Amino acid sequence: MANLQRWDGKRWVNSGVGNFIKRWDGSKWVNALVRRWNGKSWETISQQTYTKDFPVTWTRSYGGEGQYKGDWLQSNNRLYQGRYGNPDIQWEGDWGIQKSMAGFNMANLMKELEGAKIEKVELYIHNMHWWYSAGGRLSVGAHNTTNPPAKFSESRYNMAWADWRQRGGDRWVTLPKFFAEDLRDGKAKGFTLHRATQDLFYYGYFYGAGHGSKSPKLRITYTK
């Protein structure tokens, strides 16, 4: 990292960038762990690759006009996406094309990712129900709101999607690396579920915050 440099022929550059420091583990070259004594303890000064999970800390669902559905209608923090059809409209009323937002502990996430190169981003999410027994399609966007807002907002629309072939079940959904880069840089604060269509293939709901192992979380692989 900043304490370990190499000469590239023109100038001194950080050695860890690009994983230039390697060691042979008996079968392949892997990133080397380099430490130095700072007078009190050993500290790592080479780049390493880490994979960490970041659970959601809040979730909210909204109606088609962007209005907050209310805690009692969310049924214990469900994340809704899409518009349901009849007879549910007659029974429940018409909420239009529903959408959801989820956020993280941004202070912790940004501290962990500060100065990091993002390698991979995955979202764990568990479906509770699709309109069709044959499954449906999840559409993931992004937002830039720190706390749960009264109105739905979105900064990126449909940046990733994933299909289910049955009603219920969980998935790890690969998201674009720029999403974690935006989180790292404070340009995004969480993800959205939103697809601007009345197609019932997109109607479903998912476990939100407070559901233990079934709650959404990000898994980010990064080098720093």
Where on the chain are the PLM-derived regions?
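Extracellular structured ligand-interaction cores
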Residues: 99-101, 118-120, 135-137, 170, ...
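Short, surface-exposed beta-strand/strand-loop-strand elements in extracellular ectodomains
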Residues: 133-147
